């Protein structure tokens, strides 16, 4: 018979293992977010992020592809070295796969910035409901601990700055061929681009369901000039910026 302490250690180790597995990235797709954040979703549909997969199709963005020494007639939607920066969660649990492509993941959507939603979405919804019914606020840490990303600069850098000679220390193969040396328009500065609503989406007033840290560094600035959500949109039941 195993020593009681050894047995206890084994049980605790297994618990930690399965708890970690339960919180591993699990993507659900943008439709889950847009069911509450209708205004943000509507605005996002007009951005290049929403059309990211389209640019991988044959005959699209010919001039840009030629400049980057790519074949403009090739179908890059099947190329694993390209797809990762055009979809949600490629190569991660629950994320987009080439073999079984899911439309709600086939773009750079909500979860590419805000993190895979399965583990935190329920708590996020409950926070909105608690605020709506009782005026009770929820600490952001509750959803941050379950995977919601409030500081997503690295997620952006992983695609926009992932090239040879990049100033970003995390750059590694497969590199993007779309670099500032190919065209200056590929120069990427997070603090500038995150404020470009044409690149991201319009910001809308949030009802204050969440409080405390971690808080996105431009949260207050964005909220100060945010638009009022369209009538019928549920303000307090989706992602916080």
Model-derived features with residue positions:
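Bacterial N-terminal signal peptides that target proteins for export
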Residues: 1-11
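Sec/Tat signal peptide C-region and signal peptidase I cleavage site
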Residues: 5, 15-24
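Short, low-complexity polar/charged micro-motifs in intrinsically disordered terminal tails
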Residues: 14-15, 237
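Sequence context of c-type cytochrome heme-c attachment sites
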Residues: 20-106, 111, 117-149, 181-241
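Substrate-binding/catalytic groove segments of enzymes
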Residues: 119-121, 164-174
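A conserved mid-domain beta-alpha-beta active-site/ligand-binding segment of alpha/beta enzyme cores
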Residues: 156-159
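Secondary-shell segments that build the walls of catalytic and ion/ligand-binding clefts
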Residues: 176-179
